[in-house]
């Protein structure tokens, strides 16, 4: 690991050592009339995302973690008793938002945005929807550092937010990112018969030059990951 990446990962850890802040209600209403209160919905009058705020006991940080799930998931990530968002909140002891990505459906409702069968949805429009939601979360949690964490497809979206709306978060963590979308789709076709070109999706690798050099961003991927191969993350890091 290069010193640059070690420094960035260290910055993520430092965020977890700060104290907590209070949320503020902005009174924004979602398109469905529900309040964008930072508890079950967040966004703007144009589009809102469904969310679940997980508050671990004795959370003593000034960090708000936001977790974006991968493709073909989302439902389990809105639970308060298990799932990746719950684990993140529990391990870091920080308030954590489980964010339902644009177009996804859950028991709490459907997030606004485009979703074609939970495929080919890393679109410019969806990236903007996420950035709008993050901007409102900042308003609802003044004084907190915002850590955006994405897994798999959520990691791809996280990388795209970092490129197109870099002020959306104070730090970014991409886990198992399919960061080079066209080769990843080819790989999924050959390895699992689940490929097909995604004409509507942006590729984080292509957008990487837009990420400001000062951005705190880190990637993690398992050496045995047979879906989002390590080389897709490595290629992205090399482009930053």
Could you describe each region identified by the protein language model?
Residues 24-57:
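N-terminal cap/lid segment of alpha/beta-hydrolase-fold proteins
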